[in-house]
Amino acid sequence: KSYAQAVDPESRDYLLWRKEGQPLVDAAYVAESFLRGYDALWVPLDSLTKRRYIEEFTRLRRVDPPYTNWLLFSSTVECFLRKAGAKSDAYRIVSALRKVEECYVGDGFYSDGPGFAFDYYNSFVLHPMYVECLEVFTNSGKNNIWNAPDCNFQRAQKRMQRFGMILERFISPEGAFPVFGRSITYRTGTLQPLALLAWRGWLPKELSNGQVRAAMTAVINRMFGDNRNFNGKGFLTLGFNGSQPHISDWYTNNGSLYMASLA
C-alpha cells in the first residue's frame, strides 16, 4: 500500500518526485528495493502503480547528477527500468559504471568522485549499487549498450567481499563500531554491504554466516535495544546515539534516518 500511495498524486503520502534534485536519491533506494525483491515487491503491484513509477522514474532524468556517488543513483533507477522492460537511458547507466570503476583506490575502497572521503559511502551507496547494477547487465545477456564482461561483476563482488571483511573487523565484542564521516545518522546502514553479502550468499570464505550474524546482531541490540534511538511516537531520532541533531548534515531529514534499515 505504501508503494502505491507514494506515486498517487491524490494521496497525502505522494512523494515530491518533481521538485529539486533530492528525489533522485529517494527514487534510487525505491528502485533498489524493487531490484532486490522484484517478484515480491514489483510484480504484485497493479498496472496503474507500475505506470506511475515508470513515469516518475523517467522524469528524474531532469536531474544532472554530480561526479560522485550520485551517478549510481541515476544508474540504479535506469537499471531497474531496464529490468522492468521499460525504456532506459543507456548513457546514464554506462557512464556511471565506468566512472565508479575509475574511482577504485584499492583494498576494498572507492573514492567518492575525484577525491577520497573517509566516510561510510562505500557502505551506503558505492559497493551495493555498483554490484547490483553490474548484476543487471550480467544477467541480461548480450546487449548493444556496453560490452561489460562478466569479470566486471566478479571483480566488483570481490572488492565488496574485501570491504565486508573490514566492516566485520570494525565491530567490537560489545557491538560497537567506529563513528566517522558524514551521514552517520544512518546508523546501521553502515553495515549494508555485510548484510547484502550474507543475504545473497556471497560471503568470502574468511567469514561464516554465524560470525556475521552474531556481529550484526550485537550491533543492532546495542543500537536499538533500549529504545534511546526512538522518540515518544516510535520514530527514529535525528542522531547516532539518541537525539543528537547537531551531528546531522544539512541534507538529513527524518526519512533519511531509515537508511538504517538497509542492514
Spans of features found by a protein language model:
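Short, functional N-terminal and low-complexity linear motifs
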Residues: 97-98, 160-161, 225-231
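Glycine-rich phosphate/ribose-binding loops and adjacent secondary-structure elements
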Residues: 164
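Aromatic-lined, polymer-binding surfaces characteristic
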Residues: 1-160, 168-195
